[in-house]
């Protein structure tokens, strides 16, 4: 039996395993640290909206809880935290 939490992303409620929540929280914190103060709020809102969209796609039919594997796959889709932020002139 696993402990689950309820989270709200982009005004959508999800049930998520405790270990999946910890992984997601660490990922979002790492991404946030890569962003400048000016872009942080908007970009984090966009990322949370995309995570919510991906969670919704994964939670079809009889699956009701986001697990660690779901979060790992979403992180793979979104990219590493180091890929966010930085000086756009360098790209």
Task: Identify the role of each PLM range.
Residues 1-91:
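Soluble N-terminal domains of membrane-associated systems
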């Amino acid at each position: 039996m696993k402990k689950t939490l309820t989270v709200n992303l982009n005004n959508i409620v999800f049930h998520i395993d405790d270990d999946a929540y910890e992984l997601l929280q660490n990922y979002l914190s790492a991404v946030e640290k890569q962003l400048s103060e000016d872009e942080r709020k908007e970009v984090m809102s966009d990322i949370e909206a995309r995570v919510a969209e991906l969670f919704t796609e994964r939670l079809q039919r009889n699956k009701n809880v986001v697990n660690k594997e779901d979060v790992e796959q979403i992180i793979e889709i979104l990219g590493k935290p180091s890929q966010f932020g930085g000086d756009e002139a360098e790209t």
